[in-house]
Amino acid sequence: MTRSLRILYIAIFLGILLILGAWSLRSFSNFSTSAETTVLNGKWTKAAETHYDDEFPIKRLGTNLWAALDFKLFNEGRPGVVLGKDQWLYTDEEFDAVANGEQNEADNLALIQGVRDALEKQGSKLVLAIVPAKTRLYPEHIGDNKPASLHADLYQQFHAQVAKAGIFAPDLLAPLQAAKQQGQVFLRTDTHWTPMGAEVAAQQLGAAIAQKAPLEGEPEQFVTQAIETAPYKGDLTTFLPLDPLFSNLLPKPDELQKRSTDPVAGEAAGGDALFADSDVAVGLVGTSYSANPNWNFVGALKQALRSDVVNYAEDGHGPILPMLKYLQTDAFKNTPPQVVIWEFPERYLPAHNDLGEFDPKWIAELKKSRDTQENVALNAKPSESPNRAQN
């Protein structure tokens, strides 16, 4: 390399650094901190470093480039997603082995029985809505990926265990499998079900509750309408950081039909008066399958049950923590519902739960029901156990 070429190379390199540096410094025009973030306590420096790191263009370029190489060469994304066939994405929680999975299952089953007992003491009937895994409903799209053996019969084992304990858990797998012929019941790029899948589950729960735990009070009429259908970028695409440089590599967005459920005109006042201050017909506790309004699960339940439904579900905390929180609320203690539907995705049964925010003695009391009722549960007649299905 001649001296002039070396000078040109150095000049180009320095020029690129200056341009990238100036580009990053532009981000400080909208950089602001709180009053307690000062130079003296070091928080301002940390905040500035974090902001600069987030806005530095080379970082985004490197992230996009590395993600594109993983995606194209190895058919992989970041931890959290499994890439199937035909642009289908799955959460890795439905594939990975779980440390201490068997012990976690035993602990969680004990808590489930304890929750059932706590509800019954207040006069509430537990209806456990076990949501089948996406891999169980759409195994044809998982490709060469194989779930760990723990997941093979997890749904069936879950149902068998709660049936032995005498817990009412209508089967949701069979109706969801049947509904696949009419439309998509789970989103292709998301962890969750579609509004149609949520409606199928709600109808099954409504029919089962009407048969085995009919609600008291005057039925209410609800109507569901489609609002709009729009492209929807599922939560699993966040594990494919290809935007903005390689966004063309991302799976195409799902088409999500949003729905809205409202009381039939003239019914709202009567229904509100019936249950106001005296009785709550149905409470719903669960995960983002229930908490996220995009799926309209609450609305579908209202229409299927012909009753108002009070939603206590939470996004991002699994099914057990929201239920334990609900049991400690004044709403439950003062106005317990006739029925509590507990939406519980099957993959959370072997998952570990951090229960540090709860009183250990109270948790121990809840778990005691497994020991005191074990013999009764083993002799109980199974109520509704689904047939074995391939994963």
UniProtKB/Swiss-Prot annotation:
The keyword rRNA-binding does not apply. Residues 1-35 form the signal peptide. The active site is at 190, 192 (proton acceptor), 288 (nucleophile). One of its GO terms (molecular function) is acyltransferase activity. Keywords: Acyltransferase, Alginate biosynthesis, Cell inner membrane, Cell membrane, Membrane, Periplasm, Signal, Transferase. One of its GO terms (biological process) is alginic acid biosynthetic process. Together with AlgI and AlgF, forms an inner membrane complex which probably interacts with the alginate polymerization-transport complex and adds acetyl groups at the O-2 and O-3 positions of mannuronate residues. Acetylation of alginate is important for the architecture of biofilms and increases the ability of alginate to act as a defense barrier. This is Probable alginate O-acetylase AlgJ. The gene is algJ.
